[in-house]
């Protein structure tokens, strides 16, 4: 089975990083995650992430370096998660396509209920704290 390609962004503000909460009724409904979404056919990962963040949060971002690649063998469909550091270029994040959003500190990230594909990123960020945070906006 082919893996589902997904792009996510790490967006920071000071010592906090942006997380979003999935809508109720969605897969992993009301779980927290790093904002992003599926990469459509023929779409480049960075373009997909820019599109998803515009749709879901109303922001335009500069997609920077690749922070982490995670493969998670989900029961229903394997997931290939590409996580990029991002910087907001325009707009203020609003929960347009998500249940809610929150800016969290390093010590808070480990306590969030996240989908399994996000666990390696969650652990890395909480373990390394602000040292591994994305470049400041």
Residue ranges and their predicted role:
Residues 1, 126-137:
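Generic C-terminal helix-cap and adjacent flexible tail
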Residues 1-17, 38, 69:
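Conserved N-terminal beta-strand and adjoining loop/helix that marks the start
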Residues 11-12, 19, 86-88, 103:
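Conserved hydrophobic "DFG−1" position in protein kinase catalytic cores
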Residues 56-63:
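Short secondary-structure junctions
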Residues 60, 70-93, 102:
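Active-site-adjacent beta-strand/loop module that shapes the phosphate/pyrophosphate-binding cleft
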């Amino acid at each position: 089975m082919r893996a589902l390609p997904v792009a996510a962004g790490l967006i920071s503000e000071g010592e906090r990083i942006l997380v979003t909460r999935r809508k109720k009724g969605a897969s992993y409904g009301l779980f927290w995650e790093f904002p992003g979404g599926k990469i459509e056919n023929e779409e480049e990962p960075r373009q997909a992430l820019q599109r998803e963040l515009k749709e879901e949060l109303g922001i335009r971002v500069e997609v920077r370096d690749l922070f982490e690649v995670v493969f998670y063998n989900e029961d229903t469909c394997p997931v290939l998660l590409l996580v990029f550091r991002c910087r907001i270029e325009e707009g203020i994040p609003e929960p347009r396509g998500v249940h809610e959003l929150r800016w969290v500190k390093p010590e808070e990230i480990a306590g969030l209920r996240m989908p399994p594909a996000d666990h390696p990123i969650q652990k890395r960020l909480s373990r390394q704290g602000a040292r591994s945070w994305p470049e400041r906006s």
